[in-house]
Amino acid sequence: SEMCIRDRFGGMSGFPKRNESHFDAFDTGHSSTSISAGLGLVKARDLKNEHYSVVSVIGDGALTGGMAYEALNNASSLKTNFIIVLNDNTMSIAKNVGGVPHMLSNIRSSDSYYDLKENVTNTLYKLPGGDHIVERIKKTKSNLKQIILPGQMFECMGISYLGPVNGHDIEKLIKVFHVAKRINGAVIIHVVTHKGHGYKPAERNPAKFHGIGPVSYTHLTLPTIA
């Protein structure tokens, strides 16, 4: 089949192409465009008054492209629901410091956290002077996040941030996506993955195994590059 000769003459492209599949909504050559493309789908959804989630995936390498930041800025200003997955598999964009960020990440990436947050906020607003208490808590939380939580760059742009999350932990990812769907506005899920995870030859040499066609597991041969 064409899939078996992907990235070779006569085979399927390594990138989305509309003439190859009706599931490919647009033509592209690199994922620096993914957030912008997702925003287009988000805008179409909102104009049609439909309700579903749009998810764009972008790698840490693609995030170096200026188009990605233009789209992030636009995503913040639109103030509509949009999920962005940052696949961090090469470098740590925002390293954890000690165990506190890991603990806080686990807490704020759970449904129970958002249930408690909503209940406490609603209760405080009913009390005399409750609105001032809520604002004081928000300021304290913001200052604390600037000190110990990763992803502050995205938060400063007005985009909610969840993570870092182990991208190979499916159960954890499902929980985090459930939380992301409850957040109003754009949200980034920062997943940390290991390139070639689960296949030792690819783990040892991730660069050589990037974007290649199918290879034999028993007689491993890689295509040569002229």
What are these regions (language model features)?
Residues M3-D7, T218-T224:
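Conserved small/polar residues in nucleotide/adenosyl-binding loops
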Residues G59, L86-N87, I189:
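Active-site flanking residues adjacent to catalytic metal/cofactor-binding acidic residues
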Residues S1-E2, R6-L78:
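Cofactor-binding active-site loop characterized by glycine-rich and histidine/acidic residues
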Residues T90-L220:
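Long, well-ordered, tryptophan-enriched scaffold segments
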